């Protein structure tokens, strides 16, 4: 069944259908290039397929040591997260269990995490959207105050298909909608 679905997608002529009708232009099999990839938007198998793909990507990230580890004082259990995701939007999380790690070291680890995530998404045929990308560094002083970006400088850079771009960094006091919530 899977082979039948993929072969059909790769060999058919694709048109776009909207409320205004079907597109006149189309794309389809290219005998001199690679076949179209993906399973198409609106495919009923899309959510399950993406869940299967992202579960492998998340395990790769975890195997590389990325994520957020903490101890829940309520449940008395260890928690380990790599990301929060919904459909094709994902928030990566990262912390260090080393109380002596510096903000600069954490930013360097976050850059490696971003490069790894971007590479894994690229391997699926996807790409990260710079305009939807932003990050926070939650750095707390011994006095319990949040450090500003000026106090803990650093940038994260998306490779962006060979056109590197600095991702917007927000102060912890600034909210931004993500995954449909604030």
Language-model features, listed with the residues they occupy:
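Conserved polymerase palm-domain catalytic core
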Residues: 1-111, 118, 126, 137
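Short, conserved micro-motifs composed of acidic
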Residues: 16, 20, 127-174
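Residue-level preference for nonpolar/small residues embedded in alpha-helices
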Residues: 112-113, 168
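Anion (oxyanion) recognition and catalysis
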Residues: 122
């Amino acid at each position: 069944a899977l082979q039948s679905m993929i072969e059909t997608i790769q060999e058919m002529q694709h048109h776009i259908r909207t409320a205004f009708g079907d597109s006149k232009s189309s794309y389809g099999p290219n005998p001199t290039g690679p076949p179209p990839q993906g399973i198409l938007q609106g495919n009923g198998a899309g959510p399950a397929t993406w869940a299967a793909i992202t579960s492998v990507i998340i395990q790769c990230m975890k195997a590389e040591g990325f994520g957020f580890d903490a101890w829940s004082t309520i449940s008395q259990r260890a928690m380990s997260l790599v990301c929060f995701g919904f459909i094709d939007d994902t928030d990566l999380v990262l912390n260090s269990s080393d109380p002596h790690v510096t903000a600069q070291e954490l930013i360097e680890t976050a850059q490696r995490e971003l490069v790894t995530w971007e590479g894994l998404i690229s391997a699926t045929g996807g790409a990260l959207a710079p305009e939807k990308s932003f990050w926070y560094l939650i750095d707390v002083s011994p006095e319990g105050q949040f450090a500003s970006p000026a106090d803990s400088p650093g940038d994260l850079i998306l490779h962006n298909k060979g056109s590197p771009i600095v991702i917007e960094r927000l102060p912890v006091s600034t909210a931004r909608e993500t995954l449909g919530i604030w």
